Amino acid sequence: MRRLALACLPILLWACQPKKAAEQTNGRSVVDSARTKAESVNDFQIVPGLRVGPVRYSTSEAELLRLLGPEVVTVGDSIYGAEGDVLIGTTLYKDTADQLQILYQDSAQRQHPELVLIRPYVVDADGTPLPDVKPTRWSTADGVRIGMPLRELEQRNGKPFRLWGFGWDYGGSVSNWQGGRFDMGTQTMLSVMLAPPSTLSPAQTRALDSVSGDGEFMSSNQAMQLLGPVVQTMQVTLKP
């Protein structure tokens, strides 16, 4: 943060501090109040194909701004995709554990959300995990959520599934639910990407090496089970 070099008496500088603190406190109060109001119209429920909280296919960026307010909605935001793509969309709850990004079918007018990305802000620009991050509140009715361990995801699917090896743009993405509970055939409305734990034991490091690369692996693979990846991001497709 840029600091101003002020030449003033210590007593004058001290006298200015309570006002500044009060302004900061009031600013936080306004933001907190606005977000509390927004949460009254957002249940953080994911229904693949239908909605993600208040976001539906019929929604526009302008409508979200009216509904949730500028404290929650970042309009015309840069959204980074695979292979270096940069797209323009909308971000909700930017730089928080509830961060959500929206890409539209009509990208010019930002209408008709097509893809909704649940991407919690949990690491800094260098990839270092942020301390004391609260769990994201987004969840499906089946309980699928960010941070869910591989084994629990298997249990909720009802059987093992396939996922891509780690270490590349699509690494950790579920490629086939293998006829389980989350299998919707060719119409995939919920895509899930898993990632290895932030800290690894020597055995887990060896396991990661064996399940990396652009090949597919079963979740029941012994090395995959030892590695114990968790759900890192989710992508929801909304139907017209």
What are the residue ranges of the model-derived segments?
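Short helix/turn-capping signatures at newly exposed starts of structured segments
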Residues: 17-166, 170, 174-240
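Sec-dependent bacterial lipoprotein signal peptides
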Residues: 1-14
